[in-house]
Amino acid sequence: MSDPAVEVTPAVPVASPAKAKKEKKPKSDKPKKPKAPRTHPPVSEMVVNAVKTLKERGGSSLQAIKKFLVAQYKVDVDKLAPFIKKYLKSAVEKGQLLQTKGKGASGSFKLPAAAKKEKVVKKPTKAAAEKKPKKAAAKPKKAGEKKVKKTIAKKPKAAAATKIKKPVAKTTKKPAAAKPAAKKAAPKPKAAPKPKAAKTETKPKRAAAPKAKKPAAEKKPKAAKKPAAKKA
């Protein structure tokens, strides 16, 4: 009898644990060095500030800009030299800087007139905007003061008008001036009795008060008796 054929499966190679660990480790797990913080502003800002402060008529050269950066920001200019040149070229192309001499980054550079005017105009607009609310706040105070002054000024005027009216009424009521006129007029006209009668008629009209009538009536008969005795 023949033996049955037995199938033999090939053995699968099992990965060793040491190799699996090596494959899992990524290369990016290495600790990265922390970047040192910047001790100076960006190159573009430093260069523009250098050109502003130097204010050279013919423009500031690359060497003058470097000296300013060293003195002002204490920067290693040798390391920043390529960045400075790159910014100068791009600033000239964009119109942020004017190149008065040379070509590329080897010439002299100056700020354009338009940039200067914009900066000069912007400053007064801010100052004017701050001053406007102050004026608006001061106006209502002035108006309030004027109103108070007007009301105070009107009151004394009314009081003065009332004071003036009172003495006028007193002068009309006093008939003291009529009494001495009657005494003087009685003895003078001795010869003519007619004018005496006319004066007696005018006297009661002038005297409005009842007090003036009594003394005038008593004096009239005395003056009339004296001329009658002389004629007889």
Curated annotation (Swiss-Prot):
Keyword annotations from UniProtKB, A to Z: Chromosome, DNA-binding, Nucleus
GO biological process, one term: nucleosome assembly
Domain named H15: residues: 39-113
Low complexity composition bias: residue spans: 1-18
Main location: nucleus
Basic residues composition bias: residue spans: 132-141, 147-173, 181-197, 205-214, 222-232
Disulfide bonds: none
Location in or out of the cell: Nucleus; Chromosome
GO MF: double-stranded DNA binding; nucleosomal DNA binding; structural constituent of chromatin
Pfam family, one: Linker_histone
CC annotations in GO: nucleosome; nucleus
Region annotation (Disordered) ranges: 1-44, 99-232
PANTHER family, alphabetized: H15 DOMAIN-CONTAINING PROTEIN-RELATED (PTHR11467:SF20), HISTONE H1 (PTHR11467)
Family, similarity comment: Belongs to the histone H1/H5 family.
Function: Histones H1 are necessary for the condensation of nucleosome chains into higher-order structures.
Name of the featured protein: Histone H1B
The organism's taxonomic lineage, starting at the top: Eukaryota, Metazoa, Ecdysozoa, Arthropoda, Hexapoda
